[in-house]
């Protein structure tokens, strides 16, 4: 472009009130050319996330976003492109599909803030996944389940069910995290392991609220003390893990699941999962009188909805409520 043409172009921009410094225009042009893959990688790198979460986001992006949308300039993303991508993923893996969409939507929210696009093209209305209708275990059923679990780490069943710790939180509890004056025992949840690639990396807990002390019910505290006193189950020293394999290594979720499934089968509940023990704890705490706020603190949740989500229905509890309602009416069943 010669000087006269350049001046004419600049004058046009001024007349249309669109003029900005050339350097700024060049920077904006370069930014608008950044692709979805480049921007997503930058977005993940800049987020203050736990290592495991970053790895999970990267996996969803690598497997489901980059192959289709990776080469598309962020500035050219449209609702039509997103709808086509969403439909192309199919319905075989709904959870992975939903997570990939949530990553892309979060990335595009930041792109709006960065003024790369005027609005977020991710506008698909997702149906919330159906809540699992699971009946809570009774303490008696819990004893049967625990009785079928490998004795070396049987105490884990009771800890998960009565304290509502996440499995990842439990397997990082060390001797130094156990506060016990002989009467009251608290477990300080401060770290959590996560799989990053082929390695297990210990980092922050799932959320800031997840860092918390959890008071252990006295009967479970007694079990933990007995477990800690058994040198075949727990090593000495402040760094010793509370729950381990027979070789003293960190207990894996797969190994614990295999053992736990035997217990679930024993009571005719093969549908249950490890995480359901956390829900049992929330239900038992609520039945013991915990308020929603107290449940939020105990479970390490940031919203009442999440705390309520973990409470299960109990047929026996429903019968007890019905009896108490009659008592309020002055009638003794």
Curated annotation (Swiss-Prot):
Pfam families: Phage_integrase. Residues 132-323 form the Tyr recombinase domain. It comes from the Viruses. GO terms for molecular function: DNA binding; hydrolase activity; transferase activity. Its EC number is 2.7.7.-, 3.1.-.-. GO terms for biological process: DNA integration; DNA recombination; establishment of integrated proviral latency; symbiont entry into host cell; viral genome integration into host DNA. Belongs to the 'phage' integrase family. This is Integrase. It comes from Mycobacterium phage FRAT1 (Mycobacteriophage FRAT1). The lineage of its organism: Viruses.
């Amino acid at each position: 472009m010669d000087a006269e043409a350049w001046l004419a172009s600049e004058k046009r921009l001024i007349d249309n009130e669109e003029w900005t410094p050339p350097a700024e225009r060049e920077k904006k042009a370069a930014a608008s050319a950044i692709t979805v893959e480049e921007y997503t990688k930058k977005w993940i790198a800049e987020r203050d996330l736990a290592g495991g979460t970053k790895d999970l986001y990267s996996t969803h992006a690598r497997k489901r976003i980059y192959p289709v949308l990776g080469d598309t300039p962020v500035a050219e993303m449209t609702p039509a492109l997103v709808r086509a991508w969403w439909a192309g993923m199919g319905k075989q893996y709904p959870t992975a599909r939903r997570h990939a969409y949530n990553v892309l939507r979060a990335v595009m929210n930041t792109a709006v803030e960065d003024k790369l696009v005027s609005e977020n093209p991710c506008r698909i209305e997702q149906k919330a996944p159906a809540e699992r209708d699971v009946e809570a275990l009774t303490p008696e059923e819990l004893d049967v389940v625990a009785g079928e679990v490998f004795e070396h780490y049987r105490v884990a069943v009771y800890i998960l069910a009565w304290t509502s710790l996440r499995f990842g939180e439990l397997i990082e509890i060390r001797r130094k995290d156990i506060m016990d004056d002989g009467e009251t025992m608290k477990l300080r949840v401060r770290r959590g392991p996560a799989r990053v690639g082929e390695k297990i990396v210990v980092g922050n807990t799932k959320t800031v609220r997840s860092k918390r002390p959890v008071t252990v019910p006295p009967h479970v505290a007694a079990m933990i003390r007995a477990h800690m006193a058994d040198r075949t189950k727990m090593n000495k020293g402040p760094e010793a893990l509370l729950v381990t394999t027979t070789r003293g290594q960190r207990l894996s979720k797969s190994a614990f699941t295999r053992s736990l499934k035997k217990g679930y089968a024993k009571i005719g509940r093969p549908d249950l999962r490890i995480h359901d023990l956390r829900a049992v704890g929330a239900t038992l705490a609520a039945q013991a009188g915990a308020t929603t706020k107290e449940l939020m603190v105990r479970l390490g949740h940031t919203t009442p909805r999440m705390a309520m989500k973990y409470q299960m229905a109990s047929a026996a509890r429903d019968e007890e409520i019905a009896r108490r309602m009659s008592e309020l009416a002055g009638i003794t069943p």
